Amino acid sequence: MQNRTGLILCALALLMGFLMVCLGAFFISWGSIFDCQGSLIAAYLLLPLGFVILLSGIFWSNYRQVTESKGVLRHMLRQHLAHGALPVATVDRPDFYPPAYEESLEVEKQSCPAEREASGIPPPLYTETGLEFQDGNDSHPEAPPSYRESIAGLVVTAISEDAQRRGQEC
């Protein structure tokens, strides 16, 4: 019976808080239309009071849920403690898996200096656009056009495109 009464009071607090906030907002909008000073005073009293009641109802319902579920959690905790220490499951790494991260770092530290000394050859040259091998002798096959040549080419293409558009319109 006490559980049901608490539930009803909690729901009533939530409902009353919500209704008081709504009523306060209504009085504020009504007071701005009709210039009634009494409704504004009531609105400014109802809004904070409604928020306080609404928040207290929210916290009250949360408190009730926690206290109800606390009994269930205590029961589950007692069951687990009665069984003793829980076994810890571990996974053994078979030999065919790659080494762990820490082990691979140790191998790299040992092998890298020896490789650098042995090779002594710089890496091959690559182009900017792809990973194709580029011959060292033919690094710049042709010089880029000058600024005047590139602008002249743009003007010629713009004029030809404009002429094509005019021809299509006719």
Swiss-Prot record:
It is found in: Membrane. Keywords: Membrane, Transmembrane, Transmembrane helix. It is a multi-pass membrane protein. InterPro entries: TMEM252. It comes from the Eukaryota. Residues 112-147 are annotated as: Disordered. The keyword Transmembrane helix applies. The chain crosses the membrane at residues 8-28, 40-60. Its main location: membrane. One of its GO terms (cellular component) is membrane. It holds the Pfam family TMEM252. This is Transmembrane protein 252. It comes from Homo sapiens. The lineage of its organism: Eukaryota, Metazoa, Chordata, Craniata, Vertebrata.
